[in-house]
Amino acid sequence: MNDLLKTKLKLIPHKPGCYLWKDEFDQIIYIGKAKDLYNRTHSYFNGPKDNKTSKLVSNIKDLEYIVVNNVNEALILENNLIKTHRPKYNILLKDGSNYPYIMITNEQYPRLKYVRTYDKNKGIYFGPLADSTNKYQLFNLLNSIFPFNKCNHQPHQKCIYYDLHRCINQVQPQTYEKAIAEVKEIFKGNLDHILAILENKEQHAVAKLDFENAQKYAEQQKALTYIINSGLVQLDNNESFDVVGFYEKNNYLVIIIFNYVKGKLLNKSADTFAIYDHEINELITSFLMQYYSQNRISTKIIVSLDDDNLLALSQRFKTKFINAQTKFHKQILKLAFDNAILYFDSNIKSVINKQNELDEALNQLKQILKLPDLSMIECFDNSNINLSLPIAGMIVYQNGKLNNKLNRKYNLMTTKNASDYHFMIEVITRRYQRLVSQHQKLPNLIVVDGGKLQVNAALYALEQLQISIPLIGLKKDQKHKTNAIVLANGDEIILDRKSVLYKFLANMQNDVHNYAISFLRNKHTKSIFNSLLNDVQGLGKKRLNELLNYYDSINDLKSASDQELLQFLPKNVLVNLREKLNKI
């Protein structure tokens, strides 16, 4: 422990708050909360420690702390700080790991949607749902049974789904309320009423010799029963609650959440984490803060935690976080813990191997480049169509893992002397001129997709900005496969295709290429639409964007029926559009 850290530790007060451990590069590597900051921070340096906690402690060179009024405030602050900094040694939910929901919008004419974000102000949510494939089948089935609104058209307009008898169009609010009530019952596992309705429709169709619809209703009954029942475990009571089980071994932690609705298990989610802190209560609490900040929360959560954290979570989410108190709750909690053990045993080898491969790849890259830290890597790729519509994409790796929230897209403005060289100069200049002007931290490494040309262009841009950041290129072979690292001095290091470093860099190059090319395709499609259709009378920017969001190409637009297009356009504009499309 250095003298600076010793001095700061002596000055920490016996008050609640958050502490931020930093490494020798001033990077925040771990964030925690405490009822007593002094006692909690000193506990890291007192007494025996396991290997992973020792690894964390050995990297601690400095700290910051923030004092708050109570543990509840500390819990909220900790969650916000973790979201912002995503420290290396914290438990982090994977980016985009939100579980799916089936949602009924709160619009005047409600729609049924399959979504991965939860916002209680936008509608009624059912979930979270674990099995994406099965639950998407359920979504399609519900959409076929209940004719919710299928589009964004005005209520006086009929759409293609209306003609297929799959869209209600304009109806009385009571009709929607009835459909919503039926969906709620289905998600409670109460199928008797809807199955009776479908059976009645089947018999009515048979009586009319309408065997096609009779078969459809029979298949809907069978599919609905299978999908719902295959995902349910029935309890002997009618409670709704979540159960959190966990298991820790060899510095790895499995957390499982069971979601029960009206006595039926609707969902099981599981995550595995490497852990570097010995306070399991704090780790579980941090995870639950992240999880329930982006997923729907039950009215009761049963979890084995200390009273302080249970109270803080309850106050934060305004719901009950409790220890198992009844015999029944203890049995359910034991089931969750048993499942966590089974999940650990079946998945831990894969988790450890992936983490070891990532650590080894980063260590190999550090050795090659003689860099002590690679916690932040920014990777660039430019793309264009014969030097027109130039764009660039930037992806960001934090501690070796892609953080999609930090990715950026650039519409490049270079027109004079347009070339790959000048496009690279522009994007590097724009990116780091902004970081410097906003006093933001620079990355540990810049990676450009390309060879000496792209590397030299990026170096020139950095020189003009008078900043120094380590930089390499990733060069492909004649088969367009990742082949070599191009150093700033122009030297090339051929990669061993069997190495973990090759796998890491090849994935990085593919990720940035796919990110950039996807952006270019969207821009190209929009450009074609604009150039071909900008003179269609009545087709303004708003309507054109609606068509762009729905149709991938001019050919798709040409093959669309009038019924489809009338969802977006008045009849007179549709006539003008058809005249234009017939000339293309």
Swiss-Prot record:
Main location: cytoplasm
Subcellular location(s) per record: Cytoplasm
Domain GIY-YIG: 14-91
Keyword Cytoplasm: yes
Any one of the GO CC terms: excinuclease repair complex
Any one GO biological process: SOS response
Keyword terms: Cytoplasm, DNA damage, DNA excision, DNA repair, Excision nuclease, SOS response
SMART domains the UniProt entry points to: GIYc
A molecular function GO annotation: excinuclease ABC activity
A Pfam family hit: UvrC_RNaseH_dom
Domain UVR intervals: 192-227
Keyword Cytoplasm tagged: yes
NCBIfam families from the UniProt entry: uvrC
Quaternary structure and interacting proteins, as annotated: Interacts with UvrB in an incision complex.
Family: Belongs to the UvrC family.
Record's function text: The UvrABC repair system catalyzes the recognition and processing of DNA lesions. UvrC both incises the 5' and 3' sides of the lesion. The N-terminal half is responsible for the 3' incision and the C-terminal half is responsible for the 5' incision.
Name of the featured protein: UvrABC system protein C
Organism: Ureaplasma urealyticum serovar 10 (strain ATCC 33699 / Western)
